């Protein structure tokens, strides 16, 4: 019962904070708020330049493999647990899914800079 009550309070508080965070900035909208910030000076050129998709894909790939390392770091401590089969299966599935993603990106030439 206490767990259910704590869960309901957390969900209610989260929904309330998300609602306030989306609703509050729209009350006082003016042009300076919508402009990009450039060190306190007026922008020298348009700040809405197109962004290269290659850089975006490399950044997303880096984040995915950074997350993989973060998820695999507790592996040595998890080996000391009683049920190592489940832990090893989970780690194998994680590495397999990420390897398949890398292979797919490689075959789709997402890592090629010359094109």
From Swiss-Prot:
GO biological process terms, semicolon-separated: mitochondrial electron transport, NADH to ubiquinone
Q: Where are the transmembrane segments?
A: 4-24, 55-75, 86-106
Give the GO molecular function terms. Answer: NADH dehydrogenase (ubiquinone) activity
Q: What is its EC number?
A: 7.1.1.2
Q: Name one GO cellular component term.
A: NADH dehydrogenase complex
Cystine pairs annotated here are none
Q: What reaction gets catalysed by this protein?
A: a ubiquinone + NADH + 5 H(+)(in) = a ubiquinol + NAD(+) + 4 H(+)(out)
Its placement in the membrane is given as:
Multi-pass membrane protein
Cite the Pfam families for this sequence. Oxidored_q4
Looking up Gene3D superfamilies in the UniProt record yields: NADH:ubiquinone/plastoquinone oxidoreductase, chain 3
Keyword Protease attached: no
Q: Quick one: where is this thing mainly located?
A: mitochondrion
The alphabetized UniProt keywords are: Electron transport, Membrane, Mitochondrion, Mitochondrion inner membrane, NAD, Respiratory chain, Translocase, Transmembrane, Transmembrane helix, Transport, Ubiquinone
Q: Which subcellular locations apply to this protein? A: Mitochondrion inner membrane
The record ties this protein, via InterPro entries, to: NADH_UbQ/plastoQ_OxRdtase_su3 (IPR000440), NDAH_ubi_oxred_su3_sf (IPR038430)
Top enzyme class? translocase
Function in brief: Core subunit of the mitochondrial membrane respiratory chain NADH dehydrogenase (Complex I) which catalyzes electron transfer from NADH through the respiratory chain, using ubiquinone as an electron acceptor. Essential for the catalytic activity of complex I.
- Oligomeric and partner information: Core subunit of respiratory chain NADH dehydrogenase (Complex I) which is composed of 45 different subunits. Interacts with TMEM186. Interacts with TMEM242.
UniProt lists the family membership as follows: Belongs to the complex I subunit 3 family.
Q: Which PANTHER family match?
A: NADH-UBIQUINONE OXIDOREDUCTASE CHAIN 3 (PTHR11058:SF9)
Name of the protein: NADH-ubiquinone oxidoreductase chain 3
Recorded source organism is: Peromyscus gossypinus
The UniProt gene name for this protein comes to MT-ND3
């Amino acid at each position: 019962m206490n767990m259910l009550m704590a869960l309901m309070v957390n969900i209610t508080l989260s929904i309330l904070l998300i609602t306030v965070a989306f609703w509050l900035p729209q009350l006082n909208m003016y042009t300076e708020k919508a402009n990009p910030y450039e060190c306190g000076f007026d922008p020298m050129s348009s700040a809405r330049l197109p962004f290269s998709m290659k850089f975006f894909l490399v950044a997303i790939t880096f984040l995915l493999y950074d997350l993989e390392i973060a998820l695999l770091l507790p592996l040595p401590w998890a080996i000391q647990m009683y049920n190592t089969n489940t832990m090893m299966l989970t780690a194998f599935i994680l590495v397999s899914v990420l390897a398949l993603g890398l292979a797919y990106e490689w075959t789709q030439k997402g890592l090629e800079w010359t094109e």
